[in-house]
């Protein structure tokens, strides 16, 4: 296992929110005392924990598909991949507001294509979120020629999908490529014949949990 890239322990996406929460807590603490400022210190602590982005051990098995997000497994099913029009195995991870919201590549590979779809903002724990909600999809191709589709899905509260790569980019497994704020979902479509290594309800960690094994 290895950690293949450096990054701050607090996600850059959260720095403005952390700074504002800290400033408000300090101002109220100075003006009115700790008692009045306590709710704002608690808010500051919540914001810090929300935007935490810890390094993770990264399994290096050639056929391993890693979880792209922290959260809970809400779907494992054979479906038609709507992006590549093929039979596939779909595994979905639901992220609540207490999970780390950094998204990381499930495999080593090249970004073949990227698609953005505008949509609704229904509860991301529901299956219909995969086809109705705002979403951003990446088509990744591994060195062995396997195609993996990784889809960031906005949720009821999360209405900001951030993706930092385009077609032609190379991603290492576990590499950070995006972020979704305040609860959301990530769907992974794998080649037919892939074997799931998780079950419904399992808690998973981005980069360190093995979701499945490629054929």
Swiss-Prot record:
A Pfam family matched in the record:
PS_Dcarbxylase
GO-annotated cellular components: plasma membrane
Q: Which GO terms describe its molecular function?
A: phosphatidylserine decarboxylase activity
Lineage, top-rank taxon, reads Bacteria
- Annotated site residue numbers, Cleavage (non-hydrolytic): 183-184
Q: Which UniProt keywords apply?
A: Cell membrane, Decarboxylase, Lipid biosynthesis, Lipid metabolism, Lyase, Membrane, Phospholipid biosynthesis, Phospholipid metabolism, Pyruvate, Zymogen
UniProt PTM: Is synthesized initially as an inactive proenzyme. Formation of the active enzyme involves a self-maturation process in which the active site pyruvoyl group is generated from an internal serine residue via an autocatalytic post-translational modification. Two non-identical subunits are generated from the proenzyme in this reaction, and the pyruvate is formed at the N-terminus of the alpha chain, which is derived from the carboxyl end of the proenzyme.
Q: In which pathway does it act?
A: Phospholipid metabolism; phosphatidylethanolamine biosynthesis; phosphatidylethanolamine from CDP-diacylglycerol: step 2/2
Q: Where is the active site?
A: 184 (schiff-base intermediate with substrate)
Where is this protein found?
Cell membrane
Return the InterPro entries for the record.
PS_Dcarbxylase (IPR003817), PSD-A (IPR033175)
* Reported cofactor(s): pyruvate
EC assignment: the record states 4.1.1.65
State the Gene Ontology BP annotations.
phosphatidylethanolamine biosynthetic process
Q: What class of enzyme is it?
A: lyase
Q: Which residues carry this modification: Pyruvic acid (Ser)?
A: 184
Q: How is the cofactor bound?
A: Binds 1 pyruvoyl group covalently per subunit.
This chain's function reads: Catalyzes the formation of phosphatidylethanolamine (PtdEtn) from phosphatidylserine (PtdSer).
Please give the family membership noted in the entry: Belongs to the phosphatidylserine decarboxylase family. PSD-A subfamily.
Q: What quaternary structure, including any partners, is listed in this protein's UniProt entry?
A: Heterodimer of a large membrane-associated beta subunit and a small pyruvoyl-containing alpha subunit.
PANTHER family for this protein = ARCHAETIDYLSERINE DECARBOXYLASE PROENZYME-RELATED
What is this protein's record name? Answer: Phosphatidylserine decarboxylase proenzyme
Species classification: Bacteria, Pseudomonadati, Pseudomonadota, Betaproteobacteria, Rhodocyclales
């Amino acid at each position: 296992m290895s950690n293949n890239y450096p990054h701050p322990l607090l996600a850059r996406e959260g720095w403005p929110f952390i700074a504002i929460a800290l400033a408000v807590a300090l101002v109220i603490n100075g003006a009115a005392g700790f008692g009045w400022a306590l709710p704002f210190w608690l808010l500051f602590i919540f914001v810090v924990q929300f935007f935490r982005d810890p390094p993770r051990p990264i399994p290096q098995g050639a056929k391993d598909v890693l979880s792209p997000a922290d959260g809970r497994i809400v779907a494992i099913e054979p479906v038609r991949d709507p992006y590549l029009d093929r039979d596939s195995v779909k595994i979905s991870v639901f992220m609540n507001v207490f999970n780390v919201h950094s998204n990381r590549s499930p495999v080593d590979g090249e970004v073949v294509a990227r698609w953005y779809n505008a949509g609704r903002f229904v509860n991301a724990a529901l299956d219909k979120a995969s086809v109705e909600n705002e979403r951003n999809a990446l088509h990744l191709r591994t060195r062995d020629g396997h195609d993996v589709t990784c889809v960031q899905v906005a949720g009821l509260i999360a209405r900001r999908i951030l993706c930092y790569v385009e077609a032609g980019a190379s991603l290492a497994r576990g590499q950070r490529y995006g972020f979704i704020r305040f609860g959301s979902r990530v769907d992974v479509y794998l080649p037919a014949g892939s074997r799931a290594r998780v079950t419904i309800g399992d808690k998973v960690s981005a980069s360190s949990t093995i979701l499945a094994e490629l054929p």
